[in-house]
Amino acid sequence: FKKDGFLNVKVNLNTIPDSVGKNNLKMLINIDRGDRIKINSIDFSGNEVYSNFKLKGKLKNTKQKLLGRFWKKSKFIDDDFDEDKENLIDFFKEKGYRDARIVSDSIIINENNSLTLKINIEEGKRYYFGDIKFIGNSVYNNFQLRQILGIKKGDPYNGVLLKKQIANDKKPDANDLTNLYQNNGYLFSSINAVEVSAEEDTINYEIRINEGKLAQFNKISVVGNTKTNDRVIYREIRTKPGELYSKDKVVRTVRELGQLGFFDPEQISPDFKNVDPNSGTVDIEYGLVEAGASQVEIQGGYGGGGFIGSFGFSVNNFSVQNLKNKKAWTPFPMGDGQTLSLRLQATQFYNAYSFSFIEPWLGGRQPFQFSTSFSHTTQYRYDYFTGRADKSQYMQISGMSIGLAKRLRVPDDYFTLSQVIQFQYFDLKNYFTGLFTFGDGKANNLNYTIALSRNNTFTNPIFPVGGSTFTLSGKFTLPYSLITGEDFSDLASNPFYQLPNGEPDVQKIDQAKFSWLEFYKIKFNGTWYTRIIDKLILKTQTDFGFLGAYNTDRGNIPFERFYVGGDGMNQTFAMDGREVIALRGYPNQSLSTRDGSLLYNKFTAELRYPITLKPSASIFALTFLESGNGYNSFRNFNPFESKRSAGMGIRIFMPAFGLLGIDFAHGFDSIIPGQTSPNGWETHFIIGQNF
């Protein structure tokens, strides 16, 4: 009750005989919780350098009443107040006031069931760093150590910074003195800062270093992998027996195992065993907890004039090798880290199936990731007279792709170079819906995609707490018209491409232009994750895309365009190869013309906070700001015409269902050109994707 602000709670315990047994008693607990008491004001005294307002801001968990602040209550909790007092003194020490202390603090209960906190502070004088000498170092010289320490003579004294630059407990891969030794074999090293003298306002230090003996990794083992085969794990482990010990390799191993997606990233624990300073060896055992890696979807219903059914599954830890092993089907053969996905969907007017397979480790020590996919889609026209599908009017799209990706070593091994060759075949018969510029004909799309990406996000791929990702990709077809020299500038004057009345036959012209699609597409995505405080994470993201043509006479293709706005969930029915770009706060695809955009940009700032990160379900809340728009050319591009929005939402990730979520977003701008009224509120449901 006191943690909820009921400081005057009273509890009385009474016992009465129990009629059931002679030796039994009933206990009655009478609780009078009283009124909730909130902090009315926080008063400081003795502070001369920093204002009351500044010091109140350093009390992270103890806040006085403030109208409109809903995210932090003004209740008083003893433990939180004690922690805040320590933070307050640390703030003074960071600014050079080493002797700062809280002389006294008191609580005054007011008549209106509120309280006043009074804090009396003695700031003391400001100190500065004097001489900083290194003692005991032989591996690194003084200059190298000073570069890492980052503190110079004459700097304002900062005990918190000094401690952090020697060993940062909150950041395992920090650039500090301890990690300098730990990352280069000196597991048994120890570093201590000792104050040797204080002259007036100057403090002199010695950094005493015991380098110890070089250490090597001895036995490396894993436990807890009940489904995943050992070889899948060991190929990701950076700590090798016989190699020099490196803390950085241990941290990187934890990150790589978490990125696999097969284990609970919050429970990956490297356990140091048999640490022997005499022999200079250490064993490491990685403790793992398997997480679900399969998603199955079976749906059925009636709507749109007929039965709608879909079936799909995605197995992220599949094993082709165990296909013939009947005992391995539980419900799928698992353990080799492969990804297998299959989806079937059928209605009266639409049927589609797709298959994809990814082998993440094709080859030996320098492997490639191999991927392949197949898909086929048929869409029939709706007959308004019969209410049924007219199978004489249809569109069919068949596609396949094959890809290779390789992790690079330069600039660093967070980089990946991927390449994909894709072919799509479009067959249209009497399909005059406006989706394509021609309703009879065929089109072929043979393209090559190359992408350079870097991903150094921290361990948990569902909720990264640091790091960044970026991808720069280019998608290209052959410049057929430049190779063949075919002239598309004057097709309208050719009688073959004219209607009987002499007017240009636009559909026939477009069929000639786009029988083999000719284009290039450039895209960029950059995402950064920054820890604000504790588990509060800021995600910032920027996206850009451009679709261009080699031959201006042939023009831009009606396929592969960008459609901006909404939840981004219409990819399944993107029949013309369009890319649906989510921008919350606006209706789906409302920020592009009917024909789509050739250019788009988008910016996102999103605050995330986890509610739970358990293997069974990861849940986090978010609030965001977004802006972006679609354009028809670079000449029309104007970043000041971006459509802005803000909102909040929640994400739930369950291994069996993938990512689910809902967002409530307010669009601040109009989707109708020339109008200024805001679009207003939109609700977006998120299934199986992440922004």
Where on the chain are the PLM-derived regions?
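C-terminal outer-membrane beta-barrel translocator/porin domains of Gram-negative envelope proteins
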Residues: 277-278, 294-303, 434-611, 623-624, ...
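Outer-membrane beta-barrel transmembrane domain signature
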Residues: 628-645
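In a subset of proteins, long, contiguous C-terminal domains/tails are tracked
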Residues: 493-494, 503-506, 519, 528, ...
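Gram-negative/organellar outer-membrane beta-barrel architecture
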Residues: 4, 8-10, 20-21, 38, ...
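Hydrophobic alpha-helical bundle architecture
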Residues: 606-614, 637-638, 651
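Periplasmic polypeptide-binding modules associated with outer-membrane biogenesis and secretion
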Residues: 1-302, 306, 315, 323-354, ...
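Outer-membrane beta-barrel domain signature
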Residues: 16, 77-79, 106-108, 163-167, ...
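Secondary-structure transition into beta-strands, especially the periplasmic turns and strand N-termini
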Residues: 408-415, 530-538, 614-616, 658
